Amino acid sequence: MRSFILPCSTVVTKKGRSLFLIVSMALAFSLLSIAAYAGSFDGPAELPRVLVQSALASTPSPGKSWTVPAGGNVQTAVNNARCGDTIYLQAGATYTGTLTLPAKACDSQHWITIRTNAPDTALPGPTARMTPCYAGVSSLPGRPSFNCSAPKNVLAKIVYNGTNWYPVYVSDGANHYRLIGLEITRTPGPNVVYGLIFIRNTFRVDHLVFDRLWIHGTPNSDTAHGVSLGGSQFVAVLNSYINDLHCVAISGACTDSQAVGGGVGSLPKGPYQIVNNFLESAGENILFGGGSASSTPVDIEIRKNHFFKPLTWMKGSPGFVGGTNGNPFVVKNHLELKNAQRVLLDSNIMENTWGGFSQGGFSVLLTPKNQTLNGVNVCPSCQVTDVTIRYSRISHVAGGFQIANALSDGGGIPLAGQRYSIHDVVVDDIDGTKYKGGGLLAQLGTGPRVPKLQDVQIQHVTAFPPHTMLVVGNILSNPDMLNFIFTNNLVTTGPFPVWSAGGSTNCASSDVPLIVLQTCFTPYTFTHNGLIASPANFSTSKWPAGNYFPSNTAAVQFASYNGGIGGDYHLLSGSPFKNAGTDGKDLGADINTLNSALSGVY
């Protein structure tokens, strides 16, 4: 393979260039994807039908190699590269401005790779996480340690120094690019930068892999989006460290932030692969939906990520960090789905979220939304369907799950919200006071005039809500919510175990667990749960038959309860809830499988 060096003044010409014709886009797509779980379900939820094939072997660049030295023109090299070429950027160098990825007629055997020229041996392995250590940064205040004993700067840095634009901009029609070993950021300042890697909602873009990148804003500046997926298909965000995405305004120029976001616009969207990343954002760490759309993103794989918000972003905390004006960043949740279908959330750690702005400190929101913009409801086709959440740990939150079908602020009706499977999840350190919310495990509800919530299963969950186990809402004139299953869980009930979301016409207004379940759900299954420390005024007769009522957490016989904060929630061999599930397994999460799934997630 022949290599070329581009001096600072060199312009790469198109002389002799040949284009690779794409005979069939369907064939090209098939070469980067596989039928992953086609026809497979987790409980009621269909699993993704297609996964992005993002291994290095699946994204070959067999063409020429070009090197852009420090001070060279990266854009010239990219503009003139042929499909299949590799462009090397100088390790440790800074390239200022915007890198635009232009449309080229590439195919699945001829990717354009843009990467640091540091050798592979100087980078994390192809399935290992990038951290700031590889940019010479040994630690970041308020973040988990990334075990950097020998920091080294082997990344090439792309830094945007303006306003209202982006460090990496993906053009309409761009396809078959892989970025490796880059730091992508902005300069500090009071100006808003709306995205670091940006794809417009109106642009048809496909086959992109963002691999082992450090994508970040600055500690105090408003930076809205890390990776904005726009109108894209077959995109992977892998092995990357994304941090300092935040906005300070409840209304105004920068109101919401995400590490990764998409799900709006009229173009086909998905599949997406978001795997083995550190994802930090004040708003939603991941968001799908929230704007005008006439199509739904499909086949979304979210695995092995660490969702995180530094507690230093909470006003009044030691070492508080806010915006350039001193105000706190707007905090919302870890994952919010307003428009998404066939989503797998598997083997993730989700830490730190709180209320105090427009939300109540829930970790996960499954809330289809026909969003209202300028008085118009702009997404009647928005749905959240077929979502699986499993083998994950949620900690330091005001609530676990908000699951609801509701009208938008302008009265917009979503298409559907249904078929959710949640199992083998630990939710601990739920604290409504500290994290400014309700202190509950889950809220389930259907608003007026919207499609009813149905087919929700919550099984083998270990959780310690201090206030309320379930909040339920549905007006009596609505049809009952269908097919609710709550089994094999180990959960503290709190003093208000199954409670009404409010209103005298709510099906849950009795606040008596058995009556609420009978009145709100048809049919329902609520059995073989360990309902820990249920209050004396809610005797066993006020619950469905077939459940267990340990008087306190000690009676459960956890290996180490530790106050419900970071404990070892294995059951001791003598626990009465060992092998007590409907399936012969222990009540609560399968801790062995969960720990194995989370191995290597940091």
Regions found by a protein language model. Give the residues of each.
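Acidic Gly/Asp/Thr-rich repetitive segments characteristic of extracellular carbohydrate-active
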Residues: 55-96, 100, 164-167, 575, ...
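Bacterial N-terminal signal peptides
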Residues: 22-33
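Extracellular beta-strand/beta-solenoid scaffold signature
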Residues: 109-112, 155-169, 190-201, 219-230, ...
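N-terminal secretory signal peptides that target proteins for export/translocation
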Residues: 1-16
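Acidic, glycine- and Ser/Thr-rich low-complexity intrinsically disordered tracts
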Residues: 37-64, 128-153, 325, 330, ...
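Short, conserved loop/helix-junction motifs that constitute active-site signature segments
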Residues: 103-108, 518-520
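Right-handed parallel beta-helix
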Residues: 111, 175-186, 204-217, 233-248, ...
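Right-handed parallel beta-helix/beta-spiral solenoid domain characteristic of secreted/periplasmic
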Residues: 70, 105-193, 212, 217-219
